[in-house]
A protein has these predicted regions:
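Active-site neighborhoods and metal-handling regions in enzymes and metal-associated proteins
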Residues: 2-244
């Protein structure tokens, strides 16, 4: 009974708090939350499972379902935005308004999968991988070179660096190697906070936001008409950066 109101006290459920306590700025955690690491590991595995299903004649929607099956088997019930699958001309578009279609994989093709699971614990993952189908040496070369410059750029990440500086490091490699940035918003990634992407905007030429916590880095580019993309999460910790 409440002494002030004279009404009976109703027991409350435990206070609800986010699975990932967000601490922006230099007081961010040294290491990424284990749940975030798990979510990204699952995203990478699901992307690879989807690509493993890819073969000539298989449609974008069927590739998407292969990725969804992998997520469902891991207990995932939701994604935070659609799974993007691109083959043929559709590899040149990767955007939330462009869902998988009935376009089938050709004998020589590139298959792109961008997947975004939410784990049962509430953590978000974000991963893009590509696979070359058939005898397509130009595509193999484009994908290999993009992945190489991507990971070399990630090695230059440092805690608190401005987003536009990371963009510049990537851009100064893309153009000399013959790549044209394809992202519709002219960026190479975005922030990823608990329950929200893009809260700190994008990794682009105009964003001076210091990078702390999780950011998705995803160069999406074409060379000689062949579109390729790769994406990883980076944890910008208090003292070091870690590729998840």
């Amino acid at each position: 009974m409440s002494a002030m109101t004279g009404t009976a006290c109703v027991p409350h459920a435990p206070r609800l708090t986010p699975a990932w306590t967000y601490r922006p700025g230099p007081d961010v955690a040294h290491s990424p939350p284990p749940g975030l690491v798990e979510a990204q590991s699952l995203a990478k595995a699901a992307a690879m499972a989807a690509l493993a299903f890819a073969a000539p004649g298989v449609t974008e929607r069927e590739v998407e379902l292969a990725g969804s099956d992998h997520l469902s088997a891991a207990g995932v019930e939701h994604v935070w935005t659609i799974t993007n699958v691109g083959v043929g001309s559709n590899t040149h578009i990767c955007f939330p308004t462009h869902p998988p279609t009935d376009l089938a994989i050709a004998k020589r093709d590139v298959v792109m999968v961008d997947i975004h699971p939410i784990t049962p614990a509430g953590f978000w993952g974000d991963c893009t991988r590509c696979r070359v189908i058939g005898d397509y040496p130009e595509a193999v070369s484009a994908l290999r070179d993009l992945e190489a410059l991507h990971y070399e750029t990630l090695e230059k990440c440092r805690p608190g660096m401005p987003a536009n500086e990371l963009f510049g490091l990537s851009a100064q490699r893309l153009m000399p190697e013959g790549f044209e940035l394809l992202d519709l918003l002219a960026n190479i990634g975005h922030s990823l906070t608990p329950g929200a992407a893009y809260l700190h905007n994008f990794i682009d030429a105009g964003n001076e936001t210091p990078m702390w916590g999780a950011w998705a880095v995803e160069p999406f580019a074409a060379r000689d008409g062949i579109a390729v993309k790769v994406e990883d999460l980076v944890w910008f910790g208090r003292d070091t950066c870690q590729i998840l």
